[in-house]
């Protein structure tokens, strides 16, 4: 039975089969690249006046069962160490389903690359983008208004049901409240186990809540967007992706109303932000490396990653290889020299264009569960199902609350690498000092 059964208002048609098989989070079968960016979004009437609408704001939140009783909220532990709904036991992968592990924390946690003692709070004056761009941004001190939008979708009853996404949201809400002072009354939570229509994670509700999140944002405010669910890729129609593909997330009703692409999320949650406003986005989904479409992606050494310069080599690379194999060394060298010059100029031009399109004067940070070409795992930690990325972020921050951005990225990877192939990514809307203390 597809999620929302009994709530016919949300379904609108026969139950869809759920996101693609194998936890690869790609588009549903036969739907590759068929969802164009919504025309004229947001839909008429967005954002509603006085949003959140009546009954939507989490009055008196959290409801019973969300209380911060340790990592595993009471009543949400699986029994007997088993998972149902096609999930596997003991970390074995079966039938193409995603991997599930019961892991111990990595013994070398905290030994990652980076400054273990962050340099302190962010500077209070505007910062330049460099390279004579004339652009500036401002770090947020995160002392203003705090708001959070948390989305967790288990797709309950579908053939690609997930187990840890709703738990991720519960754990994240408690973490934000306990460690960074976010009020439950300033959190909007969308999960597919709720009865209120406005809290079901449909495409409409997710977009509406994104707009609520950034509405009336001011300098030094701190906003959080956390998504745990299926993710995928679709063909890039704008030309701002190095890979030629856009990252997407799958709402509960994606079969009816389509997915949400990274360009839309960027336009809704990044572009409206004023200088000095902080948005922290956390994506626990597959193919989520650049899910918020931010131009600066950082390595575990704290430097901006360079684009793949060989991806545009095309026939030039083939000609160079052919010349080499036939003994024409000078021809090979000539071809390769032309390739390097062409690609370097193209990469520089494309990168400058992307920065102009996607950079922001605000302070936007995105931490994602994996690279754009990787999948992200469901885990079993602390006696409950959880997303591996959400677990590693919360565990790392609980154990080392005073650490830098670089240390956080490396420690998350350290926790995951013993059992998972995924590599968390950190991207920014501006050049980031990775040795500053992580705040949100």
UniProtKB/Swiss-Prot annotation:
The protein's name: Metacaspase-1
Domain of life of the source: Eukaryota
PANTHER family given in the database record: METACASPASE-1, METACASPASE-4
GO BP annotations listed: apoptotic process; protein quality control for misfolded or incompletely synthesized proteins
Residue spans of biased composition, Gly residues class: 82-94
Ranges where the record places region Disordered: 1-134
Purpose: Involved in cell death (apoptosis).
Annotated family: Belongs to the peptidase C14B family.
Organism of derivation: Debaryomyces hansenii (strain ATCC 36239 / CBS 767 / BCRC 21394 / JCM 1990 / NBRC 0083 / IGC 2968) (Yeast)
Active site: 230, 286
GO cellular component: cytosol; nucleus
Keyword DNA repair: no
Keywords assigned: Apoptosis, Hydrolase, Protease, Thiol protease, Zymogen
Native organism taxonomy: Eukaryota, Fungi, Dikarya, Ascomycota, Saccharomycotina
Compositional bias ranges of the Low complexity kind: 52-81
Known EC number: 3.4.22.-
GO molecular function: calcium-dependent cysteine-type endopeptidase activity
Compositionally biased tracts (Pro residues): 14-51
Keyword Hydrolase: yes
Pfam families linked to this entry: Peptidase_C14
